[in-house]
Amino acid sequence: MATISQLVRNPRKDKVQKTSVPALEACPQKRGVCTRVYTTTPKKPNSAMRKVARVRLTNGFEVTSYIGGEGHNLQEHSVILIRGGRVKDLPGVRYHTVRGALDTSGVTARRKGRSKYGAKRPKA
């Protein structure tokens, strides 16, 4: 235990918390423009063609964002909204594209978990 005089000379320092989503700069979402839309393969033991986009954000950051759901309408120069949330089997992908916002369409014919994919409620 430190003495009072030691603490007066050298006060205790707060631990600096490191964020897992630095490009958001403490915001819930950020807007950006797609610079490249492509597919990539996940780490072992998984196998798929995961859809991702390279995005230049309004704050100048360039990040890789995962495009969830079946099918998408994104191409180069599409304006999208990204949120935090990594994809465990894609190294370097720390952001998700928000479906149904800006130029990103919602997932068509989605019945369950619709709010996560920007899908409207089906007619009866």
Curated annotation (Swiss-Prot):
Biological process according to GO: translation
Residue stretches of biased makeup (Basic residues): 109-124
Keywords per UniProt: Methylation, Ribonucleoprotein, Ribosomal protein, RNA-binding, rRNA-binding, tRNA-binding
An MF annotation (GO) of this entry: tRNA binding
One annotated Gene Ontology cellular component of this protein: small ribosomal subunit
PROSITE patterns: RIBOSOMAL_S12
Annotated segments matching region Disordered: 1-20, 104-124
Xref: SUPFAM superfamilies: Nucleic acid-binding proteins (SSF50249)
Sequence positions bearing 3-methylthioaspartic acid: 89
Coiled-coil region: none
One Pfam family from the record: Ribosom_S12_S23
InterPro entries: NA-bd_OB-fold, Ribosomal_uS12, Ribosomal_uS12_bac
Annotated Gene3D superfamilies: Nucleic acid-binding proteins
Role this protein plays: With S4 and S5 plays an important role in translational accuracy. Interacts with and stabilizes bases of the 16S rRNA that are involved in tRNA selection in the A site and with the mRNA backbone. Located at the interface of the 30S and 50S subunits, it traverses the body of the 30S subunit contacting proteins on the other side and probably holding the rRNA structure together. The combined cluster of proteins S8, S12 and S17 appears to hold together the shoulder and platform of the 30S subunit.
Assembly with partners or alone: Part of the 30S ribosomal subunit. Contacts proteins S8 and S17. May interact with IF1 in the 30S initiation complex.
Family of the protein in this entry: Belongs to the universal ribosomal protein uS12 family.
Name of this chain's protein: Small ribosomal subunit protein uS12
Originating species: Psychromonas ingrahamii (strain DSM 17664 / CCUG 51855 / 37)
Source organism phylogeny: Bacteria, Pseudomonadati, Pseudomonadota, Gammaproteobacteria, Alteromonadales
Gene designation: rpsL
